[in-house]
Amino acid sequence: MLMAGQRGAWTMGDVVEKSLEGPLAPSTDEPSQKTGDLVEILNGEKVKFDDAGLSLILQNGLETLRMENALTDVILCVDIQEFSCHRVVLAAASNYFRAMFCNDLKEKYEKRIIIKGVDAETMHTLLDYTYTSKALITKQNVQRVLEAANLFQFLRMVDACASFLTEALNPENCVGILRLADTHSLDSLKKQVQSYIIQNFVQILNSEEFLDLPVDTLHHILKSDDLYVTEEAQVFETVMSWVRHKPSERLCLLPYVLENVRLPLLDPWYFVETVEADPLIRQCPEVFPLLQEARMYHLSGNEIISERTKPRMHEFQSEVFMIIGGCTKDERFVAEVTCLDPLRRSRLEVAKLPLTEHELESENKKWVEFACVTLKNEVYISGGKETQHDVWKYNSSINKWIQIEYLNIGRWRHKMVVLGGKVYVIGGFDGLQRINNVETYDPFHNCWSEAAPLLVHVSSFAATSHKKKLYVIGGGPNGKLATDKTQCYDPSTNKWSLKAAMPVEAKCINAVSFRDRIYVVGGAMRALYAYSPLEDSWCLVTQLSHERASCGIAPCNNRLYITGGRDEKNEVIATVLCWDPEAQKLTEECVLPRGVSHHGSVTIRKSYTHIRRIVPGAVSV
Amino acid sequence: MLMAGQRGAWTMGDVVEKSLEGPLAPSTDEPSQKTGDLVEILNGEKVKFDDAGLSLILQNGLETLRMENALTDVILCVDIQEFSCHRVVLAAASNYFRAMFCNDLKEKYEKRIIIKGVDAETMHTLLDYTYTSKALITKQNVQRVLEAANLFQFLRMVDACASFLTEALNPENCVGILRLADTHSLDSLKKQVQSYIIQNFVQILNSEEFLDLPVDTLHHILKSDDLYVTEEAQVFETVMSWVRHKPSERLCLLPYVLENVRLPLLDPWYFVETVEADPLIRQCPEVFPLLQEARMYHLSGNEIISERTKPRMHEFQSEVFMIIGGCTKDERFVAEVTCLDPLRRSRLEVAKLPLTEHELESENKKWVEFACVTLKNEVYISGGKETQHDVWKYNSSINKWIQIEYLNIGRWRHKMVVLGGKVYVIGGFDGLQRINNVETYDPFHNCWSEAAPLLVHVSSFAATSHKKKLYVIGGGPNGKLATDKTQCYDPSTNKWSLKAAMPVEAKCINAVSFRDRIYVVGGAMRALYAYSPLEDSWCLVTQLSHERASCGIAPCNNRLYITGGRDEKNEVIATVLCWDPEAQKLTEECVLPRGVSHHGSVTIRKSYTHIRRIVPGAVSV
């Protein structure tokens, strides 16, 4: 299917952006309040007089007294200058002076008080401000005024300086301002500067000052999805120059700051040549787990999921989840393959499923109840309705389906899982009965060989891998409607064993492993369950409004996306739910153009430079 | 093209094995010699009497004297036993006793001599053997007899024991025998045992004794191509258990023994999970270069070539060089792609070039003067005659050609090179003139982008990468027949510079980088030249009998294979030459079914389990 696209802008297969925004983010506006004024009580006899303007008059009066050095009862000595002012005014305007004058301190009685920590000019500015509400903040004095205002607790002046600084932010001064905010724990200013640095990271990372950034700030900035980098290598090099700036002091901090560098997203060659060979990295054994995670990700792809495998917003790649084939209303079969990008809220159709573009609809292959999985960013699909042997893999870079070696045993309602960088095809239905056969694929030799068979023959079960073990959950066994058994395979012993059973017997279910739990959904369960391999225990995560038999579930953008399925009345469902494990919240993400069930759903990393012209007839027989 | 094959046995596209064996290995048989006897001199008067049997009679006589203790002039005291014998007999049979009795040593005069280092029973056996030529070697006494015979220099007895041991070799005793041979520096026995261990490695590596193997022997055994392992992982695990057996002593030897483990051939996942994570490996910084080589090989394939990237004989994979397309006699174009395996002396045709199987010959694409290179074991081909833009890649595991993104600038007589895990397309001819444009391919984004252009516009040049730099050699520049310029690109500076010029101006040439030199052949040079990037100097390697314009050259099995080309009379050549850098020898390897020139020639690692049924129509549009 020919897709045309402008350079740099993602266009949808068909316009959906509107529908995506629709029901989800209603903006609320607070009614704005006008400043108070003369308010009459209705019954006419009494008047609540609220003279908003009086405070200004009062203040002018105080200023005039100060100008005439009248009734002044304290002299603030700063450097060589002396400022006479009124204790009561200072106490009213500043908690610092309030504490000084109202508590039983010696200053309470002294006529002349020596003030440290501020220069005369800044004192002059602050006193003028106190008595006139006016002050001239300039690039030259803002830092001194802010520090003094913070010291004497002139909080409104502190905010004024902070917003002055926020406006004046530029690549050269932002780090300095950040340190200022840090030392005086001005949290809102700090947040503003941090998001400025995040947005303008590329211009800032080369500045000298950046190298003096405190470690926590650096750690926080590097964690952000919105960090404006097009290549993760820029992030790695920033961290390394930051450490190299003060090696003795900062080598021990390397694991902490490296934690937020998304090493798996680095170009594999760059990773080997620059990261692996970096002398500091080689001297620091604690970073080993981070290196191993990246090494395994380069070999296996999504089998390794962590906050470091999610592309950042401005990198030319995006984590997307796919809806592959399946069937829709009135049992029509779906040949389309759709990529959904929750971060950019876009939907894109890619190359149709193989053997689905014959003139005669009846000749088209029905990709239903097949199995699918991602290995090294390629989507493998196998088998399908009526005991198929076919195996194809989809390469999203070249947007093509490519056939690989047939399965030894044709099957459907089975599952595929990636474990230790190898694809496993597990169980399913061979047209006669449920089978326990398991096959693994060797990509170099392009051949399937048998692995240890299941303990219980099942079909329409859920399956996924988690920390070097493979889990097969529930499904329909021979001679029974459904089972609650959890079967677990350990490749190091090549043995299957039973783990804690599910809370319910269920089939037509799907599972994904995310962070340290396995999530299961579908069947007649009307709920999302989670299994903890560590504790070998199950728990209910959340109820669902409807049954979702044969729905899809895929981890993407640090959330779980549940797609389609069949409700209690066996109707196809078109909505996509989103479960946010951190916020523990279930939301309806969007509505698909049409309902779908018995489809495949996986996650891949998709290139986002632009859609180049892709010409049919692109692969030889 | 459907290829059928039995399980486990490679069958040729067409029977060729005969022709390969033909002209190359004539076996010679030495005439056998009969033992000497009575020889008459022709003229009848004198007879040269050579009584071969006399020595036996003499020996029996001496034995009888010994039995009767007659004329015995020395008593050898061994433990509590005494052996009286004749000095002259002992001296004649053993250099040890000759030295003892003939030199001015005290033993020369002593009647009774105490003999150390041998037990009575063994002495008895040796003396019987000396006087009767007979001895009974058994499993129980062979070690003691051999040690004594070696001590007393009964060399024929030593050999007899050695061959007894060689016959009796089994997985349990071979290591012991090897140590025996080692300590007594019995080189021939040592060699025999080493080759026994190499042939039966899998059974032996688990034996306890294996862990006591001396380091040099282990190092030697692991180096062998014939080491009987089907998976390189078996070699790695052997080395690690050998080191772990005496860690304190052997950790420092790890880099030395690991040197002969072919880490690049390990399954990439096994490499990350087991090798990278091994505690001893992580404690040993000196192995870093070996790890880096494997990491880069997993990313880039043949850009990294060393003794460790060549599969061993019994592993289910083989290094093969390919002959791709080109043209043959009377300008007919070749659509076939052939793999030649020098180790197994086999030739196999694989999937034909893309777009070459139309009914109408004229519609077929003419794959001539295109460029080709291997990246991550996939063969990339681009452009070709009449300014083509096509780019395809061949995956040998699934035996398919797959189209990828077009070149920005169509070209032919250009070259492709892999550098830093990236494919570069360089210069060439765009139908009008030679160009200096260089493009690089990003596999993830499937797009070509421009890189720094050549200094000199050239076509039909030679090009290769060597230790992180790219070299463009000779070729036809605009306005001149040929050039001798060597252009060098350094990606770290993104700059081209000129290096030492070739000894001759030449075009229609090809180059490969092998170990620390770049070899160039072809054009009208009638010779193979080599360039040393280290010394930036050229030298003549060897003359060739004919010109070989537009021939192919590929490194395989630690040798260089030069294929086809055009001779002085512009006739296509069918022979394949082999240059062995170690032996500095040029040999004619084999003759192809037909001559070929302007073809592509690269090296890949090919799976050797078996040819499974590969069905046409295997890739979706």
UniProtKB/Swiss-Prot annotation, chains A, B:
Pfam families: BACK, BTB, Kelch_1, Kelch_KLHDC2_KLHL20_DRC7. Residues 174-276 form the BACK domain. Keywords: Kelch repeat, Repeat. It comes from the Eukaryota. GO terms for molecular function: ubiquitin-like ligase-substrate adaptor activity. GO terms for biological process: B cell receptor signaling pathway; germinal center formation; proteasome-mediated ubiquitin-dependent protein catabolic process; response to bacterium. Residues 72-139 form the BTB domain. GO terms for cellular component: Cul3-RING ubiquitin ligase complex; cytoplasm. InterPro entries: BACK, BTB-kelch_protein, BTB/POZ_dom, BTB_POZ_KLHL6, Kelch-typ_b-propeller, Kelch_1, SKP1/BTB/POZ_sf. Kelch repeats lie at residues 320-367, 378-421, 422-468, 470-516, 517-558, 560-606. The keyword Metal-binding does not apply. Found in germinal center B-cells. Involved in B-lymphocyte antigen receptor signaling and germinal center formation. This is Kelch-like protein 6. It comes from Homo sapiens (Human). The lineage of its organism: Eukaryota, Metazoa, Chordata, Craniata, Vertebrata.
